[in-house]
Amino acid sequence: MPYRLDITQGDWPGDLLHKGVEGLLAEAMVLTLATAGHEHGPHANLAFYAHDEDLVLYFVSERSTRHSHHLAEEARAAATVFLPPPAFGEQLRGLQLTGSAGEAWGRQAEAALAAYQGRYPSFAQDEETRRQYLTGGGAAALYRFQVEELTAVDEPNFGRRNYLRARVVRGW
């Protein structure tokens, strides 16, 4: 387990929370990323994502988008990942994430591409497209979101309205 979750709110064992977070990230496919910039104000967008064993989420975006401009100005970001509930008011399952995000370069780009292709095997199959993502030569780029803190709600597993908040600890 390359990262540990230190629970700051709630009363659930950390290893079970870790398992729940990993399960939810594996089951969901899209995140909502929230950014803010000095000129354009707050913004939210959707992106397909992949994640690695260090709780880093990777996504692809055009450099021309508002959120990409925001991340170039300010790395702080928030995201949500959730599964649709079966009915209104029942069985909420999701994560609220805060951390830092930005373009992935060098080894980070290699890790991003490996994670993304691991989840979406048809992504960037030709050598030229892979090279553009790894060198930053295209209109689109690989981005990384390093989760620093999370709030989890998983009513089927943790109970109704049991919000668990945790800090992500790496390199322990």
What are these regions (language model features)?
Residues 65-67, 86, 158-160:
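Short, surface-exposed beta-strand-loop junctions and turns on beta-sheet-rich folds
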